[in-house]
Amino acid sequence: MKAAAVRFLAIVLITLALSAPVAAQSDGIRATISGQMDAFRADDFDTAFGFAAPNIKSMFGTSDRFGTMVRNGYPMVWKNANVRYLELRELSGNLWQMVQVEAQDGSFHYLDYMMVETENGWQIAAVQFLPDPGVGA
């Protein structure tokens, strides 16, 4: 009985130790996405552009062009009413944070944020639309 309790405790401690880095990643990732969402709501595209990874910055070049893309292609993100963080997962070596975004009109949208850790902390390297998980279920 005592050996079983010791094994159980060891498993719990190992699980906690392994999950701690994920929790730390999750906090940093959420802070990055939240910071960009706050900047979008304030129409502060300079700050929002600062959360973009180097590949995105290179693609758009300026915060003005980035802002135009967001306003036209991601209006629910630009003027979001609420953001809910869903699953954080690793796919093919990349970390993807799924979010549910509530738009100003009350509609819900699901997006996946590919996150990269840089010398400046977590940054957003890609965003893609996801199908509504409730559709077709």
Model-derived regions: residue spans:
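N-terminal secretory signal peptides that target proteins for export/translocation
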Residues: 1-4
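Bacterial N-terminal signal peptides
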Residues: 7-19
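Residue-level detector of flexible, active-site-proximal loop/helix-junction positions
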Residues: 15, 55, 131
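Sec/Tat signal peptide C-region and signal peptidase I cleavage site
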Residues: 20-24
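Short solvent-exposed beta->alpha transition segments
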Residues: 27-35, 45-92
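Exposed beta-sheet edge and beta->alpha loop/turn motif
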Residues: 87-137
